[in-house]
Structures are given as structure tokens and as C-alpha cells.
């Protein structure tokens, strides 16, 4: 087999995720006497470089990238020991990990794979890695580069601790520091003293090579710091931020019912066109006027309050609640039968939910990550127990609650099929499944959908005003999966939820994090009434230009950059931009999340600005 032929075949096998074939071909080429470094340089490095390019231009999504990385690792496992025997120097020695307090790892795992495929020797320290552990690993492995990943805004300061610890150990001058993660920016990297910032997992290899060569870290020139109309600080104009190192592993957001919307009396004054009376609007009618584009006298308000805010800022929270009473509330979940599971979902430690999924949490006030999938093997799927106790809703309590408030009431359940599949299967395993969906996955989706429809039907027959559902579908710059796959498998599920709500005279509300612009037309097509999404990730003005007047934007204010680090003036400016972009005699709800890292004065400033 000629060099050009085996190289082309190996590249193709890796890109198509044919792991067994990639390993077998590598063995054949090795047995023919080809040096391992030639296989690395001629096949694996070009394959992963092409995978990165396809990921960047959205020909690949997470399932395809993970499949390619898995095939590359199979081939690399054969040549790594041979490279060591021949003393072939790597491109560099890298220590990588997710910083202390953070359990997210998919993005970090992809970066590690990309670096290995780029010829680096990589020592992956895993997740929740302390500054001391990073420093010790640098010394142990004589590392040239440290890769730091974080997804939570509350763990970003740990990156600075790592830099300082390296300096304290006397190794900072010999090792370079590369950082990445969804909430990070190039300016943050400079602020903490890092040498570089990888805007995307696919660009991590080039970024690493540049900073090790002492060159400017040019990967950020793509516009990650350009502050587009939909990016962090609300300044300047340019492309939206690109997907970051750990972004692929973003934690699915807590169910809205697990955050605590604060409700209180609120009355609008006046009515919009088409109303029969000049009586003040109740909060419920105010929200309906916004949803129906009937010119409500002010924007409806809702604040999602996580326990983190309740324990750290009780006085400020009370002031916000007093000055800006909320119009929307999620009904407390009530079942006549005990629901399985145990522990506190927002406390440090482990929590088992009603489905038997075990979450690990390192920080009080937020929800943790599933680290022991319930369905590690598909053979266990037939025995999976669905929590039918959730169907025993105490209807009398629901009726009394809805009748006793003039707030707009959201149902006390929130189906999340994609995220439930991740919790059951494990995120990385599910992405691999989705690349070539096995029959077991499709059957589980069918069963899950039937259960959710049964649960939603119960709530649709109550007096609540809206049904809710959620799934986080975006990275920082694109969908997590190919739009075609989403439309084939998941869009029909959401269409059923919306149709069910409308048949019973309810509105349909959905939450989805990340850059989901590609599927918003689909959500409008199926009749979704309100969408909670990261509008600053996608571009406020662009979203308004394309979709204002067709769907209600249920918030939200930027919680990656503005809420934790912005000034009140920046918040006010961002709020004005949202109103200008989205409000068309309705179509905008003043919503934000008071969660980890958010400054209380910024939460106050949102409602103050949007009330004007």
C-alpha cells in the first residue's frame, strides 16, 4: 500500500468514526514497516485537523467530532508506545484539567483528544483539579503547557489561583498557560496572567503551538472578544463568540421549578388594543397581553432565583421582590404519592432524582452533574423504572393555588427529553449514540415521550396558564447536534407538547441554552409561544430583526458576562437593546436568573431599566 493511499484511508476512517477500521489499518501499516511518527504526521494529525475545520464551519457537530476522536484514539493507542521507544519528541507536553469546583468534562475531553491528535503528549488530570495538583503535575511530567477549563462563572477565579501557584512553585516561567470555557473571554485570560485563550476546542492545537513558539495567540482574532450585538458586554459590533473549550460540556440548566420564581402582587395600568375595558390588568392578563402582542402597559416580570442567591443575598433579594413584584410563578410540585429519590439537589454532595440518576455537586446553591449514568449499558434499558408517582398530582391543591393568585401560573413539571437522556445514558455516550442512533435509543425516546405526554396531559387539564418544557441545545456558537438530526428526532416531541398545550387553551413556554438560532424558525413553526434563551450569545439585534413579533422572548439577560461582571450602566444599556429589538406591542418578558456570581445591583438594574 502506497503512503498516499494508506494516509488517505486512515484520514477517512477517522473522520467517519470507524474506530475498528482505523486501528486495523494502523496495525497493517505498522506491520509493513512504516515508522509510527510517519503514521502520526501523515494520517492522524491531518485527520484531526480536518475534523477541527469541519467542526468550525459546522459540517461536524459534537457527535461527529466525538466519533472522530474515538477513532483517532484507537489508532493512537498502537503507536504511542512505539513513539516513546523511538524517543520521538512530542509537539509539547501538556497537563490539562477542569479546575476545582467544576465537574464539566466533555469540552475538556475533546480538547485533550485534539491535542493528542495534534502530536502533543497529554496528561489529563480530570475534573475538580486544585491549583496544587496542577502545579505538582507540571513538575512530575515536565510540562510545557497547562490547559485550564471551566464552565461555571464561580470557578473562573480558580484559574488565577493556578497561575499564582505555578509562580509560587517557581515554574511559571517555564510553562505556558492556556485557558478556555464558555464564560471566559480573551480579556479575562490576560487579566489572570494566562498566556493564551483558546476560543474553540478545534483551535486549541493551533493556540497551543503558537504560545509554545512564543507567537501571539491569534485564535482570538476570529471575533470571540469582538462583543457582537449578542455577546458579553453589549459593546461594539462583530461576529458572535465562538464555541469554547468546555462549552460542549455545558451543564443542562436546572428545571425552572427547581429555581424559585418569586411571586407577588403586581398590577398593570391600562390595556392594549382590542381590549373592552380600561380596568387595570392583573399580572395574569398582563402576561397574556404580552404573549398575544396586545400592547401591555409594561413588560411582565419574572426572576428565577437559585438557592445560591437566597443564601448569599437575602436582603438584596427582598428589596428586588418588593420594588419589582413578579408576574409569573411556577406552581410548587405536589404529588399524593412520595416521589423516589433522596438528598438536596442544591447541596454539596450526592443527590438521587426520581429516575434513579445520581448527581454529584461541589457547590452549594446550584445543581450538580451526573457522573454515574443509570444506563451505562443498553441491556439495562428494559428494566428502567419511570417515576409514575409524578403522575399522582394533587389536583385539589393545584386548583386552590391557581384560584388563589392573580399571577400567571406555569405548570409544576418541565419535560426535558434530551437532557433526561443525558442523565440516564451519560452525555458523551449519548452524543456517540446520536451519531448513529441504535434501536435501543429510539425505543427509549418513544417511551420517554409517552411518559412526558401523559404527565403534561394531567397538567393541561388543570387551571395553570402554561405548560413548560426545556432542553439545552446550543454551544456558544452553534447547535450541539446537526439541525437535520434535531428536526428528525426531537422537533416532533416539542411539536406534540405545544399542540397539547394549545388544545387545552394553555400557552407553551420553552427554555434552551446556547446558540440555537438555527432552530428558532422551527419553534415558531410548531407554535411555541415563549422562548427563554441566551439572546446575548446569539445576537440581540439579529434575533430581533428575524423573529420579533413572531414569538415572545422570555428574557434573558446575559448571565455569563454582564450579570457577574458588568456595571449597572452596561446592564441598563443591554436592557434597552432588548426592548428595542424584541418589543412589538408585546413579545418580551423581563426575565433574568439570579444565580451563581450574579451581582444583586445588576439584577435590580435589569428590572429598573425594563420598567421604563
Residue ranges of model-derived segments:
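Glycine-rich active-site/cofactor-binding loop and its immediate structural neighborhood
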Residues: 91-125
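Intrinsically disordered, low-complexity terminal tails and inter-domain linkers enriched
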Residues: 216-277
Amino acid at each position: 500500500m502506497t503512503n498516499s493511499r494508506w494516509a488517505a484511508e486512515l484520514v477517512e476512517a477517522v473522520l467517519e468514526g470507524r474506530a475498528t477500521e482505523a486501528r486495523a489499518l494502523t496495525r497493517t501499516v505498522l506491520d509493513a514497516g512504516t515508522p509510527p511518527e510517519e503514521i502520526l504526521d501523515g494520517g492522524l494529525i491531518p485527520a484531526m485537523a480536518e475534523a477541527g475545520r469541519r467542526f468550525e464551519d459546522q459540517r461536524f457537530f459534537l457527535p461527529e467530532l466525538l466519533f472522530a476522536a474515538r477513532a483517532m484514539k484507537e489508532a493512537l493507542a498502537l503507536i504511542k508506545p512505539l513513539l516513546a521507544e523511538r524517543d520521538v519528541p512530542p509537539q509539547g507536553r501538556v497537563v490539562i484539567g477542569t479546575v476545582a469546583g467544576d465537574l464539566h468534562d466533555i469540552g475538556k475531553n475533546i480538547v485533550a483528544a485534539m491535542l493528542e491528535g495534534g502530536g502533543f503528549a497529554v496528561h489529563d488530570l480530570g475534573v475538580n483539579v486544585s491549583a496544587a495538583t496542577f502545579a505538582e503535575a507540571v513538575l512530575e511530567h515536565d510540562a510545557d503547557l497547562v490547559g485550564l477549563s471551566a464552565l461555571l462563572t464561580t470557578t473562573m477565579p480558580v484559574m488565577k489561583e493556578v497561575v499564582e501557584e505555578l509562580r509560587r512553585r517557581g515554574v511559571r516561567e517555564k510553562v505556558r498557560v492556556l485557558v478556555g470555557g464558555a464564560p471566559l473571554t480573551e480579556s479575562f485570560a490576560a487579566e489572570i496572567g494566562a498566556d493564551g485563550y483558546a476560543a474553540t476546542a478545534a483551535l486549541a492545537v493551533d493556540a497551543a503551538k503558537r504560545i509554545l513558539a512564543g507567537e501571539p495567540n491569534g485564535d482570538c482574532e476570529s471575533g470571540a472578544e469582538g462583543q457582537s450585538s449578542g455577546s458579553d458586554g453589549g459593546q461594539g459590533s462583530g461576529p458572535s463568540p465562538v464555541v469554547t473549550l468546555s462549552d460542549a460540556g455545558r451543564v443542562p440548566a436546572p428545571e425552572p421549578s427547581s429555581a424559585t420564581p418569586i411571586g407577588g402582587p403586581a398590577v398593570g395600568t391600562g390595556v392594549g388594543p382590542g381590549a373592552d375595558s380600561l380596568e387595570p390588568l392583573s399580572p395574569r392578563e398582563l402576561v397574556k397581553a404580552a404573549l398575544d402582542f396586545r400592547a401591555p402597559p409594561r413588560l411582565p416580570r419574572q426572576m428565577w432565583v437559585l438557592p445560591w442567591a437566597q443564601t448569599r443575598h437575602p436582603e438584596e433579594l427582598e428589596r428586588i421582590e418588593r420594588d419589582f413584584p413578579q408576574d409569573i410563578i411556577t406552581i410548587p410540585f405536589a404529588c399524593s404519592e412520595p416521589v423516589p429519590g433522596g438528598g438536596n439537589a442544591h447541596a454539596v454532595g450526592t443527590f438521587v432524582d426520581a429516575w434513579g440518576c445520581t448527581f454529584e455537586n461541589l457547590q452549594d446553591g446550584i445543581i450538580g452533574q451526573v457522573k454515574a449514568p443509570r444506563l451505562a449499558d443498553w441491556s439495562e434499558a428494559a428494566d428502567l423504572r419511570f417515576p409514575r408517582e409524578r403522575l399522582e398530582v394533587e389536583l385539589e391543591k393545584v386548583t386552590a393555588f391557581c384560584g388563589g393568585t392573580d399571577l400567571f401560573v406555569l405548570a409544576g413539571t418541565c419535560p426535558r427529553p434530551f437532557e433526561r437522556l443525558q442523565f440516564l445514558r451519560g452525555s458523551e455516550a449519548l452524543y456517540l449514540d446520536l451519531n448513529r442512533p441504535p434501536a435501543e435509543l429510539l425505543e427509549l425516546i418513544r417511551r420517554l415521550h409517552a411518559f412526558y405526554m401523559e404527565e403534561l396531559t394531567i397538567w393541561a387539564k388543570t387551571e395553570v396558564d402554561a405548560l413548560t418544557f426545556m432542553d439545552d441545545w446550543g454551544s456558544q456558537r452553534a447547535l450541539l447536534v446537526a439541525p437535520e438530526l434535531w428536526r428528525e428526532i426531537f422537533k416532533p416531541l416539542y411539536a406534540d407538547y405545544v399542540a397539547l398545550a394549545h388544545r387545552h387553551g394553555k400557552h407553551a413556554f420553552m427554555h434552551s441554552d446556547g446558540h440555537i438560532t438555527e432552530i428558532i424558525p422551527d419553534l415558531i413553526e410548531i407554535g411555541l409561544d415563549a422562548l427563554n434563551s441566551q439572546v446575548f450569545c446569539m445576537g440581540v439585534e439579529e434575533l430581533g430583526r428575524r423573529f420579533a413579533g413572531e414569538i415572545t422572548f422570555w428574557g434573558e439577560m446575559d448571565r455569563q458576562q454582564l450579570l457577574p461582571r458588568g456595571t449597572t450602566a452596561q446592564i441598563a444599556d443591554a436592557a434597552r437593546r432588548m426592548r428595542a429589538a424584541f418589543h412589538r406591542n408585546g413579545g418580551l418578558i423581563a426575565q433574568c436568573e439570579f444565580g451563581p456570581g450574579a451581582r444583586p445591583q445588576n439584577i435590580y438594574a435589569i428590572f429598573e431599566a425594563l420598567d421604563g
